[in-house]
């Protein structure tokens, strides 16, 4: 019997865009559902990177912290990554060029994919969302986000590719985070150049969408869905 690969997503990106930032799921609980993924932390304090079953926080001051099981997240997506396609990237490419190559391996455009790219990057441009109070729209917070660029850095990109039909639940297309080989640099990927590396594409069969059912703010939030989708386009 074929093993089912399930993407576990806690909360939605749309809810995050609306300013619902309170962490309500622990890292310990989250990691039961997958070993690769992305997200953010309580009060959107930086970027969450899940690699090889461990969780890291890329903070706005450019530091990286390995997270303990008790730390809480308001939004995250993780998957037990199983590479269906693996290929070597042996020539210099921009992020858009590599993404086009990755998509050429997709069997259709309506399934989620897990992405893992390990390699050498002449340029890596990332951002970290700064800590903010709940209620402030994410797009407003992102206008003051710190951005950093490192040159000639080795490391790993992890993330999820989302079909267009799920835009709002997540961000359509690529949502990628990076962490360096020495765990000193990382964040939400804005753009990059890769010289060489290994690219893994994982098939995802199911989406397990979980909600913060004990969070009263989430339960009664009045969300403008069309406005939230526009905010995702701007912020992500």
Swiss-Prot record:
Identification of the protein by name: Alpha-acetolactate decarboxylase
Q: Which UniProt keywords apply?
A: Acetoin biosynthesis, Decarboxylase, Lyase
- Coiled coil, from the record: none
What PANTHER family would the database entry show? Answer: ALPHA-ACETOLACTATE DECARBOXYLASE (PTHR35524:SF1)
What GO annotations for molecular function exist for this entry? acetolactate decarboxylase activity
Q: In which pathway does it act?
A: Polyol metabolism; (R,R)-butane-2,3-diol biosynthesis; (R,R)-butane-2,3-diol from pyruvate: step 2/3
From the record, give the transmembrane residue ranges.
Answer: none
Give the organism, scientific name: Lactococcus lactis subsp. lactis (strain IL1403)
